[in-house]
Regions:
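Active-site catalytic loop in hydrolytic enzyme cores
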Residues: 58, 90-173
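A conditional alpha-helix N-cap/helix-loop micro-motif detector
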Residues: 18-19, 62, 160
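Cys-nucleophile CN-hydrolase/nitrilase-fold catalytic domain and related Cys-dependent amidase chemistry
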Residues: 15, 24-105, 111-113, 119-120
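Extreme N-terminal starter segment of soluble prokaryotic enzymes
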Residues: 1-5
Length: 173
């Protein structure tokens, strides 16, 4: 049986504190029997400063956040869908908003870069994720083998992606 835990946390600009909270929640979920733990979007860093995001972006497959998530998955023997974190993008002054999945051996099982970036323009305010984030370009799913010999396929999406059913149609095909 697949037991999924979703972790709700209030992240801020202190990556170390965010990682400490995430680790505590992951360990609690594992103790309670979860074999897949899902962290929220931007679990590692929430700040209003694009400069801080760019400064703290990790190189893909090389960074402290990725190392911690991999080590936790391995030591606890569980799968972790690491929320999203900013990864360096080839596009100048941009990052990807990336969800990384680690298997129970700590190996990366999937990478999904958020495809649908949110934007809003109101009377007195404006927000556009594309000013900082490079969008992903493809649907991603992964398979978790269960103890009974069956597999469960899991499709990945982040926040605003939920408004686009075509993403899920592509994942199911």
């Amino acid at each position: 049986m697949l037991r999924i835990a979703t972790c709700q946390m209030t992240s801020g600009p202190d990556t170390a504190a965010n990682l400490q909270t995430a680790e505590m929640l992951i360990r609690r979920a594992a103790r309670e029997g979860a074999n897949l733990v899902v962290l929220p979007e931007l679990f590692s860093l929430v700040t209003g400063s694009s400069e801080e995001v760019l400064k703290n972006a990790e190189t893909y497959q090389d960074g402290p956040i990725q190392s911690v998530m991999s080590a936790l998955a391995r030591s606890l023997g569980i799968w972790i869908a690491a929320g999203t974190l900013p990864l360096k993008s080839p596009e100048p002054n941009h990052v990807t908003n990336s969800l990384l999945v680690y298997d129970a051996f700590g190996q990366e099982a999937a990478r999904y870069d958020k495809v649908h970036l949110f934007s809003y323009e109101g009377t007195n305010e404006r927000y556009d994720e594309s000013e900082l984030y490079t969008p992903g370009h493809k649907p991603v799913s992964f398979t978790i083998p269960l103890d009974n010999g069956t597999d469960v396929r899991v499709g990945l999406a982040v926040c605003y992606d939920l408004r686009f059913p075509q993403l899920f149609r592509l994942q199911s095909g």
